[in-house]
């Protein structure tokens, strides 16, 4: 069984959810976070006010940031090196798929991913599984809607789940 998890989180610039304005990645091996990656991304699309207020990311923030194809060239080996994990994975995986498609990049994960929301509902029924609530439950520091903090927090939650909840 593979014991390498690539935990990631994306932030989006607008309601279309087909571009990425920031990505955070935390690598978990043998029950420990062994590496972290973060980058702002120029989405080459306008920002919605709501998304900018939520994430603190806007056109000025990403002015010198690389576009997604440049980032992808750097992170694809990492994203292909383990089981993908995200909190509310349907959203993050969906955004990643749409972004890859928008740039005509052919890539598919080698194995099905893991959603820590779904995992948590089976391990800890009857409580809220929103990221901030799970961080409160486990005492994990979180700067919510910051891709690097969200990916690290999700990785910590995954580790707690693997330890037995």
Feature map (PLM): residue ranges:
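A charged, well-structured terminal subsegment
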Residues: 144-160
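Short secondary-structure boundary/hinge segments and terminal tails
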Residues: 70, 118, 151-153
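Buried hydrophobic packing segments
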Residues: 96, 119, 154-158
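Conserved beta-strand -> loop -> alpha-helix junction used to position metal-binding or nucleic-acid-contacting
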Residues: 108-120
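Short leucine-rich amphipathic alpha-helical surface patches
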Residues: 120-124, 139, 162
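Conserved non-catalytic scaffold segment of RNase H-like nuclease domains
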Residues: 1-111, 125-145
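Acidic two-metal-ion nuclease catalytic site recognized across multiple nuclease folds
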Residues: 1-3, 155-165
